Amino acid sequence: DVYKRQPQAMAAPTPVSAYLHSATMVKAGVFLLARLWPALAGTEQWFWLVGGAGLATLLVGGYAAMFQNDLKGLLAYSTISHLGLITLLLGLNSPLAAVAAVFHIMNHATFKASLFMAVGIVDHESGTRDIRRLSGLRTMMPITATLAMVASAAMAGVPLLNGFLSKEMFFAETVY
């Protein structure tokens, strides 16, 4: 059900969606898991329930994001995927994974708020958020395009940007 409600909630005005959906509202459940982590982590049930739910959310959110034509819908489903990544980290029995989860929460809030604001600028200037109708924005809005590319690169985990370290911590904890 969250897979349907989350993207619909992104239709709010840009500053509202940037604040609510990058920093506060969507992080409430993850915050609860982080608060329960010291008491419940380390059990096999915690690993399978929380880690499994996180992995499923990570994959389903990423898959659904690939089919979005609305920029805010794309950001909504990528948020679902990132929340799955954070939940998966909290499902692991490792102090470094918990640190990586908290670090990624902060990184996610930073780059996702930037992307929401960029989408708001694009929507205001072009009158649409439909990816199929948008082209040539780099020449029409070079500053916005540059900032959106930097925020997107951070979200992708490009080295030297804030998303890289938390995703590197994710890989270090899940691969080894």
Predicted regions span which residues?
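Hydrophobic transmembrane alpha-helices and their helix-loop junctions in integral membrane proteins
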Residues: 1-176
